[in-house]
Structure formats: structure tokens, C-alpha cells
């Protein structure tokens, strides 16, 4: 795919804007210059880069925010990015790029260019597959260039035989934020953590399948990704694939629509570890459940590991046939309970360290004592408290935390916060109709309202990312991730955004209590 002249011209304008952006240093611009536009599909710009380091740099917060702002200004609408790797990518030979390279090299003076350390690049086939997976509705390509799973299958000693490193990182869908090292262990999750660790060290030998259940926001998804990362670190040739049940359903439907059933089977049945999240959402989807049943059987019979999460244990799952529920019980079933006070404090401490948030131990203890059931809401409370302190140039202490959280603590006897409640309250607050809120329009007010709604749906409900995108006009889950991150950051930078989120949350809580 080659970008047309209009897209190339727009990209040059975006690069020019970034050169004047204080957030993007000369070193970071060195990575920007390596990117080349491949085309614009809908509101998604396809960029190709020569290696993983460049892609990770462009996706980092510092560059991504500046890039998103520049793209929005250039195209006058919110533009998403899909960045792929192309090992054969050649730098564009244009006067402007030559001038930039000359500038980076110091021009006539011959000064040194920015010190950019680049690793070996991935293959072009990996690039095509990465683009296909990052764009909604794209057909699934079989990972033909990856080392066969059989090469990494567990041997007779119960350990997989290490295979040559593969390029399966792009197909695994693993989130780099979730590792065992960042998982806080407590009495409520110790056994689940130990089981997950054992599965990663000996796939299909320790517990197969491993079934982890518990309420939303307690760390089940974190453990799934951690299993994948640890297993791939131990056995580089291992094929791992993470998928939530809604993505599995969408991939299955697309395979039928495009008559690519064989490709779908190759993607999901030719792996060493399948990590499937929120299996309960497959309930009553007969054709999809049937396909998963056969996928499970194929993997299990070929001595491949399956790890499943759910909000309920197998026996309590409705909408599944007994033959599938019984298979969930073949291995190990373990649960995760809400964390105790000590674990909640440890979670907040680790979150504060990771995000660079300043909060004394007594403030962390106060927050942990007030929110006891949901880790996502617990971390959200910490972000609100520290954001309020930053905006008002105050020090975080118990009194400040108490003031910020006084209207946010949920009464356990109150009604459940539903998506409808959040969307209705958001529409009222911003004087928008539900149709406008879920439309494709991207005026500034609508974009802000929509992003705040996504943030609140993420924080106050148990909805998955794809489901949140679905109720807001069928948007991709990556849009939800971007909105959640954007609002978190803006709350600490802009008083208007902080006030809007706080006032809207208070109104939702008030309606929840029936006040």
C-alpha cells in the first residue's frame, strides 16, 4: 500500500508541526523521521517504521500525544494510528527529508546526529500482519512466517523445547504493562498467582486448562498477560495468543464473512498457549461457542495450554453446554477475591511508584480503607486525589483525600451503575443527545464528552474495552484505551477537565443512590 500525494503532503505538515513542538526533542524527532505513511483508511493512518524500537517510541506517551494533536489539527478530526514494522523500509529521498537529515547531522559543520540505537528489524510479513490486527474489520492472515508451534511444544521433561526466536510478538496481543513483576500478591490472589506462574513455566504440564474466576477489576487479565510474557521469555519460540471473548467472536464472524475459516483455525489452533479473557461473554452465541469447543479440543489434544478467565466458576456459567463446562473443570480452577487492606495499600504504593505520583503512606492507607472491592476504582481514586493536589498546588494528605473522595465512595446498598446511567448523565451534563454522543461527529465538545464517558465507563463499571467501544457508536477498543489515558493525564493538567469529571461522577453517584 502506498500513500497518495494528499496523505504524504499532510504527513509532511504533521512532521513540520512536531519540529516546533516542545514536547518532541531532537532525539525523538529522529524516530519520527523514520516513519512513512502508507495510507489513510477511514480515520486510521497507517504508518510503517523500520523496527520495534521506533514503533515503541512513537507509541510512547510523550510522542503519541504530540502526534495525535498534530494529526487532529491537520485532518480536522480525531485520527487513530496503526504502526507496522517493515524491515525493507527505505528513507524517503525528498528534498525536505534530505534537509532534515543534513540538519540532524549538523549540516556543514558535521556535528553528530542524535544517538539513536536501533535493534534488528522485524520482517515485512510481520508488518502486514500487525496492520491487519490493529485495524478493525481487517482479514486475519495466518502467521506463516512464525516458527511452527510443534518446535516449541513441551518435551517429555514437562518443559517446552526452546525454539529459535520468532516474530510472534505482534500476533500475541500481549499488553506490555502486565507482568508478574508488577502484580501485587496478597492472600486474596496468592494461589491464582502461583498457578499462573506454574503454567508459564511448564505449559500444558502443570494445569491444563487453568480456569481463573472472580469479579471484574481484581487482576485476572493482568495474570493472563503475565503468563504470556513469562512463557515467551522462557521459551522464545513459543506461540502465545491473548484474546478476549468479544474479539474471538468478532474474528470468527469476520472469518465467515470473508470465507476465511481455514485462516481463523490456523490462527487460533496453531498456538502453544491460548489465553482467553471473560469467557462468560460467549454465552448463548451458539456458533461461536461451537467453534471455541472445537478449538479447545484441538489445543488440548495436541498438548497445548489453555488459560481461561470468567466472572463465575464453570458450574455457574449459563449459556454453555455441559460438555464445554465439564472441559473447563479438567484442569485447575482457582479464584481471585477482593484484596484485603494490606494488599490494597501495596497496590496503591506500586501504582504511585509506576506513575510517579506523590502520596504519603497515611493517605494511601486512607484511600485503601475506603475502597475495598475493585482495583480499577481503587487506582482511579488515587489518580483523582493526586490530580486534585497537582491542580491546587497542595500536598497530598488524609484531609485532602477525604475531601476529594467524600462524594465518590459507593454505598454498597445503592443500585448498580449501568452504562445507560453514565451515558444519560454525560449527555445531560454536556447538553448532548445520546445520538450525538455515539455519532461519528468529532467536534471538540463531542470528543471531550465522549472521552470522559469512556473514562467513567472504564472506572465505574465492569465493562470490557470492546463493550465500551460498542456502546459508544461501535468504536474500536484502542480508541477507548486512548480516551482513558488522555483523561487521566488531562485531569492533572487542566482544572476544567478535572471539574467536569468530578461533577459528572458526583451526579452519577447521586442518581445511583436515588437521591
UniProtKB/Swiss-Prot annotation:
Residues 1-89 are annotated as: Domain I, interacts with DnaA modulators. Transmembrane segments: none annotated. Residues 173-389 are annotated as: Domain III, AAA+ region. Residues 390-515 are annotated as: Domain IV, binds dsDNA. SUPFAM superfamilies: P-loop containing nucleoside triphosphate hydrolases (SSF52540), TrpR-like (SSF48295). PROSITE patterns: DNAA. GO terms for molecular function: ATP binding; ATP hydrolysis activity; DNA replication origin binding; lipid binding. The keyword ATP-binding applies. Residues 89-172 are annotated as: Domain II. Keywords: ATP-binding, Cytoplasm, DNA replication, DNA-binding, Lipid-binding, Nucleotide-binding. ATP binds at residues 217, 219-221. Its main location: cytoplasm. The keyword Nucleus does not apply. Residues 90-130, 142-171 are annotated as: Disordered. HAMAP family: DnaA_bact (MF_00377). Oligomerizes as a right-handed, spiral filament on DNA at oriC. This is Chromosomal replication initiator protein DnaA. It comes from Micrococcus luteus (strain ATCC 4698 / DSM 20030 / JCM 1464 / CCM 169 / CCUG 5858 / IAM 1056 / NBRC 3333 / NCIMB 9278 / NCTC 2665 / VKM Ac-2230). The lineage of its organism: Bacteria, Bacillati, Actinomycetota, Actinomycetes, Micrococcales. The gene is dnaA.
